[in-house]
Swiss-Prot record:
GO molecular function: 3-isopropylmalate dehydrogenase activity; magnesium ion binding; NAD binding
PROSITE patterns, A to Z: IDH_IMDH
Function field: Catalyzes the oxidation of 3-carboxy-2-hydroxy-4-methylpentanoate (3-isopropylmalate) to 3-carboxy-4-methyl-2-oxopentanoate. The product decarboxylates to 4-methyl-2 oxopentanoate.
Cofactor (UniProt): Mg(2+); Mn(2+)
UniProt protein name: 3-isopropylmalate dehydrogenase
Positions annotated to bind substrate: 94, 104, 130, 215
Main location: cytoplasm
PANTHER family: 3-ISOPROPYLMALATE DEHYDROGENASE
SUPFAM superfamilies reported for this sequence: Isocitrate/Isopropylmalate dehydrogenase-like
Gene: leuB
Amino acid sequence: MEKRIVCLAGDGVGPEVMESAKEVLHMVERLYGHHFHLQDEYFGGSAIDLNGQPLPQRTLAACLASDAVLLGAVGGPRWDSAKERPEKGLLALRKGLGVFANVRPVTVESATAHLSPLKKADEIDFVVVRELTGGIYFSYPKERTDEVATDTLTYHRHEIERIVSYAFQLASKRKKKVTSIDKANVLESSKLWRTVTEEVALRYPDVELEHILVDAAAMELIRNPGRFDVIVTENLFGDILSDEASVLAGSLGMLPSASHAEKGPSLYEPIHGSAPDIAGKNKANPIAMMRSVAMMLGQSFGLTREGCAIEEAISAVLKLGKCTADIGGTETTTSFTKAVMQEMEEQALVGRGR
């Protein structure tokens, strides 16, 4: 297989974890006979430094022409007083790609379950599906004076149906349960959300549907996260709840994410930030970035075997006690990456020898 991947290393630890992603992709090429054209483009703060814009037209054009986009990290205090903020580029990139579904799998490795703030953390295995293009972040009017400020929360039927349908399709391949999170006891937009969700559910009779109000959901994520399979919710609620859920893994450096469009390339990125305090020190945890690569291989390219090989190698290395500093170890970004690559190679040799 031959695919073109645009690599947006971005800021902070982004270039370091992106290098890990590239090395893993090169290992996949060697072991499985694929070829990936990796195209580097400027994005975020590094792009602002170059030409004053966080998302240059050249970068967006390259992304649109690609088969998938990998993003390292964006932002940092260096650009806090800049006219253009790096994070603005991320919103523009999502809009330019037309991605509407943000997918965050939340799992806990048995080898690192002790780092989770919860007991029985190794029972956690769910996915948060967040609507990305509607809701209060993108609705108008937005107004502010010295005395009053106004934001508008709007959702259209087709936006709700699109994201909920995606969640049901995903659940049908997992444990067949969808939890829809809203505030239908108060918000008109949530009442429409619940109505449309129930209509979509009729098309998936083998998938269980439950509704939970967002405040109760925030509590249940901590009290009983094992009850969830696929969570689907609107933009603001998803923004908050997915960050809450990410803490369950014990480190932000463990979890990947994907953002999908109806057509065109998807965007894959770790959920952690740019971590400027450790940038350039070879301390960043590359697991979330490598898992983002695994998601890309499976979800965009249909290379499930190759994606699983990366995941299995990561788990095997962790079970050997090899961990980066954020999860209680002494491995560097490069040494952990090399350990995963070696494990991938060894597992491939064992598989071929059977």
